[in-house]
A protein has these predicted regions:
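Short arginine-rich
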Residues: 90-94
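Short amphipathic alpha-helical segments enriched in hydrophobics
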Residues: 36, 40-47, 87, 174, ...
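Hydrophobic alpha-helical membrane-insertion signals
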Residues: 1-30
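Anion-binding and metal-coordination hotspots
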Residues: 78, 83, 96-100, 108-566
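Basic, short loop/linker segments at the boundary and entry of helix-turn-helix/winged-helix-like folds
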Residues: 23-67, 71
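Contiguous, well-ordered alpha-helical segments that form the cores/surfaces of helical PPI scaffolds
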Residues: 59-70, 85, 89, 316-320, ...
Length: 566
């Protein structure tokens, strides 16, 4: 498909007349067209199309239709019908009343071009640029960030079900690609074992019988992989995606006991000694959650658990403005695998906001985003104040009523000496590494600690040892903890709660918490378009002068908050 740029023409007279007659008091889409114009043009989408070929549908209109579709949570077919039938859509798109629209498949093709071209952020960024030009958005204010879980567009499977489904997927792929080869190499029993889905399989109860069942599945998969990788097998069979995925899942789910470790067969018994396929348990070890494939139908979904919520899928992070003198607009969206910690996306979010020229002055976040390194890096790299509760101290000294915590020690960073509450100085101060991060380890002498009258409040070990972060991180964390104890902290931090309402609105109105598509890139596109659609709705409300809704309170709560009568 090639792009033939379509000029953003005026609204046809007939369309405008009918729309004004149908909506004499205005409409959100009419208002958006009158105030913001067409929002998009064809130029930013030109790199996504070839220079030759059949003319493509107008991309600026497809972008706008995509936002409307997500704003109203419509399917492709219903969105295409709305283009043909709804006068407010025709007004916003600048179409004639008689315009027949386009086939619903065009929307899927357009999203595919955005993903293939790495342009997932284009729709949101273009809208934000327009808002900056219209003075509806400004940098260096307050912004807030929060995340929520996203269920993948696949059924949740446990490890055994995932192994069975992966083998079934490989067999189905080979049955279509190489039916004669598969019939020649398949075990006759496989037809009964793997004809139905994994949840239909009869898994026997009991740990031992369940492991034996899993290892039978492992032997079947190992047999198939051995046949595929045999020298006489067609080389292209190894390149079938389902076969490669089978290999990866078998590595994470099973291990091989070498043939020499397998007891020799009894004399006269036929056959050759083969490696023993063993189901991986805690003793054998298996990959961390970030590498563990959880479904053969979306290899990028991952398992995660946060407090009482467990899910297979992704996690989405939304950042929005929260200044009182403008609309609250989402400025950045990040979709990650489910196990990725919140604070790991903070640096990337700040870099993306810096590229857009939309960095905040104060960034309100919850405790999951706050760490000593993040406090320093945000201020040093982007001049952003990270504002939120700090990580808690879980050492027993902090939990005890009168224990001596790190705050009770005086630190002389220049002389590299720590002084304990009893006045004793440390004997050793040295740099070290812990989980890839620089730390300072401080040790006191056992000769000072053992006879100390305060030892019971300080340590249960022979001597007290401290683990410090580098000076900049340590001082930033201590300053943030001191700030957290001030009365003004709670008042300022209250502003962060509004982003939870944004997540709630996205979940209820746009199904934000359920992935529509397979794969991380397409799910990221879904979330970016959802954010842009939410911005479109908020802009319409702001232009109409609709005030922000206040937190709902019951009649009883309002009554009890009123001052008592004298």
């Amino acid at each position: 498909m090639s792009l033939r740029p379509t000029p953003c023409a005026d609204i046809p007279a007939n369309t405008a007349a009918v729309a004004r007659a149908a909506f004499p008091k205005g409409n959100v889409y009419l208002r958006l067209r009158d105030e913001l114009g067409t929002i998009f043009t064809d130029a930013p989408f030109a790199p996504l199309f070839a220079s030759r070929g059949q003319p493509a549908a107008c991309p600026w209109r497809l972008a706008l239709v995509t936002l409307l579709q997500f704003a109203e949570n419509l399917s492709d077919r219903r969105a295409a019908e709305a283009v043909r039938s709804r006068i407010d859509w025709k007004y916003l798109l600048g179409l004639e009343l008689t315009d027949p629209g386009f086939d619903a498949s065009v929307l899927s093709e357009f999203r595919g071009r955005l993903v293939a071209g790495g342009a997932e952020q284009l729709l949101l960024d273009t809208l934000l640029t327009l808002c900056r030009e219209r003075k509806l958005l400004r940098p260096r204010g307050r912004q807030r960030t929060d995340s929520t879980h996203v269920l993948g567009a696949v059924r949740g499977l446990n490890r055994l079900e995932c192994a069975i489904e992966t083998l079934r997927a490989a067999l189905n792929a080979l049955a279509s690609a190489a039916p004669d080869w598969l019939r020649a190499h398949a075990d006759p029993d496989w037809g009964e074992r793997y004809a139905g889905r994994a949840e239909e399989a009869h898994v026997p109860p009991g740990e031992a019988t369940r492991r034996a069942f899993a290892e039978q599945v492992g032997r079947d998969g190992h047999h198939l992989l051995a046949a595929v990788t045999a020298p006489e097998a067609p080389i292209w069979l190894r390149e079938v995606p389902a076969v490669e995925l089978l290999r990866r899942v078998w590595v994470q789910s099973f291990c091989l006991v070498p043939a020499e470790a397998v007891p020799a067969p009894t004399p006269g018994a036929p056959g050759q000694v083969e490696p023993l396929v063993r189901w991986r348990g805690e003793a054998e070890g298996f990959p961390a959650a970030l590498q563990l494939i959880s479904s053969p139908y979306d290899p990028e979904v991952r398992y995660a658990k946060k407090r009482t919520t467990a899910w297979i899928g992704y996690k989405v992070h939304l950042t929005e403005t929260c200044d009182e003198d403008g609309p609250h607009l989402i400025t950045h969206v990040a979709t990650t695998p489910a196990p990725v910690a919140d604070r790991e996306v903070l640096a990337g979010g700040h870099e993306a906001l810096a590229a857009k020229g939309l960095l905040p002055d104060t960034h309100l976040v919850d405790a999951g985003y706050v760490g000593a390194h993040e406090l320093v890096a945000s201020r040093r790299d982007h001049d952003v104040t990270l504002f939120g509760p700090t990580p808690k101290d879980h050492h027993w000294q902090a939990q005890a009523e009168n224990g001596f915590t790190l705050r009770d020690f005086r630190l002389d960073w220049e002389r590299e000496i720590a002084t304990c509450p009893a006045g004793q100085r440390s004997g050793r101060w040295r740099l070290d590494q812990r989980r890839g991060h620089a730390v300072v380890k401080v040790r006191f002498s056992a000769r000072d600690c053992q006879p100390c009258a305060l030892k019971a409040r300080c340590t249960h070990a022979e001597r007290r040892e401290l683990m410090l972060q580098p000076r900049a991180e340590h001082e930033a964390l201590e300053a943030a903890r001191a700030r957290e104890g001030e009365a003004a902290f709670a008042q300022e931090y209250r502003r962060r709660a509004g982003v939870e309402g944004t997540l709630s609105a996205g979940v209820r109105a746009q199904a934000l918490r359920r992935a529509r598509y397979i794969g991380l890139a397409k799910t990221q596109l879904q979330h970016v378009v959802t954010a842009a659609a939410m911005n479109l709705v908020r802009l319409g409300a702001w232009l109409a002068g609709t005030p922000l809704a206040r937190t709902r309170q019951s009649a009883f709560a309002r009554l009890m908050l009123q001052p008592a009568c004298a």
